[in-house]
């Protein structure tokens, strides 16, 4: 039974129930901001070194710059953006045209995103009244494509269909009932599991649901292949680009709550899915860096962090290299804004002795999830949004980008390109259908051919949609490194997966090393997902820690909580009582 005084709890439950009966409930993944202690050594200090120029690093620099801090940003690549950046396919531009725009993987901006959207609105872009934010366009439809079956369109439309809590399972059944082939029992069971999560308390989500995989939570093994592949795996990939068998129910449930329930059924947020209207670096990352540099940020590209030096329990300097001899850079405060696989290498035993929470970085799991782009000679708007290939062994998701871009694609490459289909590959370990090998054992050419074939068998059921002759060029994220045998040996930019039991292992943005702060997507945040939004929120938390440490008296960087429908506040308070009493959720059919 959870450790809490029941009398204290009951009084709090009654107050919470009354307070949240009207309006939106500020519930779900609320991470308390941990304040750094004002330290006389740092009071009034204003020089910050940001190590990493991806979304987290630039977000931290942005917030600090607006508060008058001197900011130096060090980035290992020649360009900013990290995994968000566009990656030109070198040498493909001819006749004065730009190189073809590749990328790490497709990206979209769900309606519940708040932190990164707020930052985008503060980045000037031409005459846009809302800056870079105005470069987002609505993706109105998801599509689930299946082998030997009709495709399923899933419109992102706002329904406003739930008036009382008992309506929720029926509303979810109606929402998902557009999928042919699922039995009423399967639909109802899945809807009931979603309802269970939506009406659960935060404590249960943190302690119980984080110990369950989404696959286990929805009891996928009890049902047929369509339930497993479409509702369990594909819906998960579409929402969060994660594998249902590995991902924490806490994480998947929160994203489903925000997108399917709060966004679509209750219309609490903006459009469910937004995409950029041109290659990412052109309409977001480059304008962002230009704005920051123009306002005074010092930018050091092609600079690798080799080590962090400690003295007296604090950071005294950072060893970096820009292709020549190592040098030591110094600042008052340091923000580590690199992915977890790099952070845990830099933050070794001396750091962990000062802050034991950093030891758990070793338990966080990055996985191979990366992208391929096919540059086509004709427009191919497969869906006005994401396409999930339900039966693809490599767990594919794609977007036809030309329909969203306001660019003339003939100005790239050799002039023959009219569309770009960007594909994410989420499973590098399952055998393919063309060569019978997992992606990790394929050559680059085999990877291109295998992905294309898996897409073809899902799309070319009622006519030819994908044609081999339409391919002008192809691009694979260069983070995939190939060895002498021609097969992948490393992924330099894997994606963190919120696996079972990972919530408690993720550190906060503030550490016990007074002048070290963390601003990356592995940090514990309300977002609870390795995304641009999560990195931006982590950066804001790091900045607020710096403001506390240095005695800053001005405004803090805003942190959003993600509101959930107030209709469920009473049910969630009831579940909090049940949780404290050691009882399961009243809708749960799992054995404890």
Question: What do these predicted regions represent?
Answer:
Residues 94-189:
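Dinucleotide-binding Rossmann-like beta1-alpha1 core, especially the glycine-rich loop
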Residues 547-591:
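Active-site-proximal substrate-binding core of FAD-dependent oxidoreductases
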């Amino acid at each position: 039974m959870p450790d809490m005084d029941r009398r204290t709890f009951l009084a709090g439950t009654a107050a919470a129930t009354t307070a949240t009966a009207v309006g939106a409930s500020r519930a779900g993944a609320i991470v308390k901001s941990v304040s750094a202690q004002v330290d006389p050594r740092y009071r009034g200090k204003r020089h910050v070194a940001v190590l990493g120029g991806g979304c987290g690093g630039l977000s931290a620099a942005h917030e600090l710059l607006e508060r008058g801090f001197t900011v130096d940003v060090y980035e290992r690549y020649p360009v900013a953006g990290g995994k968000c950046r566009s990656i030109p396919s070198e040498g493909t531009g001819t006749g004065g045209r730009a190189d073809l725009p590749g990328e790490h993987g497709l990206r979209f901006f769900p309606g519940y995103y708040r932190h990164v959207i707020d930052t985008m609105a503060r980045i000037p872009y031409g005459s846009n009244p809302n800056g870079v934010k105005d470069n987002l366009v609505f993706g109105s439809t998801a599509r689930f494509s299946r082998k030997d079956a009709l495709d399923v369109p899933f419109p992102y439309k706002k329904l406003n269909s739930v008036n009382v809590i008992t309506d929720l399972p029926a509303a979810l059944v109606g929402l998902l009932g557009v999928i042919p082939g699922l039995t009423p029992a399967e639909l109802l069971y899945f809807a009931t599991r979603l309802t269970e999560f939506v009406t659960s308390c935060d404590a249960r989500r943190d302690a119980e649901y984080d110990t369950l995989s989404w696959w286990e939570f929805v009891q996928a093994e009890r049902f047929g292949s369509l339930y497993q592949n479409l509702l369990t795996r594909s819906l998960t990939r579409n929402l969060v680009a994660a594998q249902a068998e590995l991902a924490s129910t806490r994480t998947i449930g929160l994203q489903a709550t925000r997108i399917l329930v709060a966004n679509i059924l209750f219309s609490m947020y903006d459009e469910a899915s937004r995409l950029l209207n041109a290659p990412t670096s052109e309409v977001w990352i480059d304008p962002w860096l230009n704005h920051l540099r123009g306002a005074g940020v010092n930018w050091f590209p092609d600079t690798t962090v080799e080590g962090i030096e400690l003295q007296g329990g604090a950071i005294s300097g950072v060893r970096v290299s820009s292709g020549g001899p190592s040098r030591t850079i110094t600042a008052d405060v340091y923000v580590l804004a690199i992915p977890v696989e790099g952070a845990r290498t830099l933050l070794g035993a001396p750091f962990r002795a000062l802050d034991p929470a950093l030891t758990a970085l070793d338990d966080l799991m990055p996985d191979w999830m990366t992208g391929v782009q096919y540059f086509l000679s004709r427009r191919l708007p497969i869906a006005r949004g994401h396409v999930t290939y339900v039966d693809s062994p490599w767990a594919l998701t794609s977007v036809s980008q030309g329909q969203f871009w306001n660019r003339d694609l003939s100005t790239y490459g050799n002039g023959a390109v009219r569309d770009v289909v960007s594909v994410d590959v989420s499973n590098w370990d399952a055998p393919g259908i063309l060569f019978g090998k997992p992606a990790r054992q394929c050559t680059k050419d085999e990877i291109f051919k295998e992905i294309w074939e898996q897409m073809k068998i899902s799309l070319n059921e009622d006519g030819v949609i994908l044609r081999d002759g339409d391919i002008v060029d192809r691009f694979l994220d260069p983070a995939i490194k190939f060895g002498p045998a021609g097969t992948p040996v490393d992924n330099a930019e894997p994606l963190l997966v919120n696996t079972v039991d990972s919530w408690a292992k993720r550190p906060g943005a503030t550490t016990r090393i007074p002048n070290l702060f963390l601003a990356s997507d592995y940090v514990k945040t309300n977002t609870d997902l390795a995304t641009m939004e999560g990195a931006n929120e982590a950066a804001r938390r790091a900045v607020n820690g710096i403001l506390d440490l240095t005695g800053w008296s001005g405004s803090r960087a805003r942190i959003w909580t993600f509101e959930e429908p107030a209709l469920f506040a009473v049910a969630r308070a009831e579940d909090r009582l049940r949780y404290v009493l050691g009882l399961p959720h009243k809708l749960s059919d799992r054995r404890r």
